[in-house]
Amino acid sequence: MVGEMEAKEKPKPSPDYLMQLMNDKKLMSSLPNFCGIFNHLERLLDEEISRVRKDMYNDTLNGSTEKRSAELPDAVGPIVQLQEKLYVPVKEYPDFNFVGRILGPRGLTAKQLEAETGCKIMVRGKGSMRDKKKEEQNRGKPNWEHLNEDLHVLITVEDAQNRAEIKLKRAVEEVKKLLIPAAEGEDSLKKMQLMELAILNGTYRDANIKSPALAFSLAATAQAPRIITGPAPVLPPAALRTPTPAGPTIMPLIRQIQTAVMPNGTPHPTAAIVPPGPEAGLIYTPYEYPYTLAPATSILEYPIEPSGVLGAVATKVRRHDMRVHPYQRIVTADRAATGN
């Protein structure tokens, strides 16, 4: 009906969906202009991330996504504080990383347990600190007395007596599941923690999901008709330089210039009959190098001896004028009279 809102089903918890939510939260926090403006949007995003993590955690530990009843009775009586210690079996399993299993990547597993059970969960005792030097320095100091005890998990809760007992019981059951080591290849909780760490670092890639570009190319290849063609012809290798042009070279041009003049300096009678070709005004080189085209008049700047023949030895020309020395002293009339 018009005006009624259709109830949409929430997406199922999956690593890909959790990665999208984490990317949206990271994008919102990276924008300073929008930080603190969309309060309801940030709250809904945090609630959805908590829901997906909770469902994935329950699916990992309990083997199903069925939610346990979280209903609590009404509070009766004053607020009390209850606590319980669960010692970690370090002596039985000395090589197992119980602290990392309980806390999770960046403390996400412990925070998820606290949000689900309503209790505060802390790892205390020897080996609870990552920095061993700092642990030795704090040993024996006030508020650090727990370092003298064995490694344990401290669970505390504050609520009414009837409600606190239920919360504490649920938290103890969940923590006991974490204190049971699993085989190396069968630890589903460790796989989920590594997946969450990869999502936080931005390096998570789902092996079942292909990249969009690859999927599109595969789909296009499957739908397009396949045409069988012959092998491509093998082309000869490209030449390093262009071949010699078919036009005339420079030697016929030089011969044409020399034959156009008689030995006595008069023009050849056939020069006026034979019209010059289109290449008569240019010097053409056989290869395409830059700056190779020049006017042909540059050759005529130098006089050709009438008796000179192409390839013959040029005769020496005696010059009778006196060469002027560049540093020759100029003698004027007054200096010639005095003899200086």
From Swiss-Prot:
It holds the Pfam family STAR_dimer. Keywords: Cytoplasm, Developmental protein, Differentiation, mRNA processing, mRNA splicing, mRNA transport, Nucleus, RNA-binding, SH3-binding, Translation regulation, Transport. The keyword Cytoplasm applies. It is found in: Cytoplasm; Nucleus. SMART domains: KH. The keyword Nucleus applies. Belongs to the quaking family. Homodimer; does not require RNA to homodimerize. RNA reader protein, which recognizes and binds specific RNAs, thereby regulating RNA metabolic processes, such as pre-mRNA splicing, circular RNA (circRNA) formation, mRNA export, mRNA stability and/or translation. Involved in various cellular processes, such as mRNA storage into stress granules, apoptosis, interferon response, glial cell fate and development. Binds to the 5'-NACUAAY-N(1,20)-UAAY-3' RNA core sequence. Acts as a mRNA modification reader that specifically recognizes and binds mRNA transcripts modified by internal N(7)-methylguanine (m7G). This is KH domain-containing RNA-binding protein QKI.
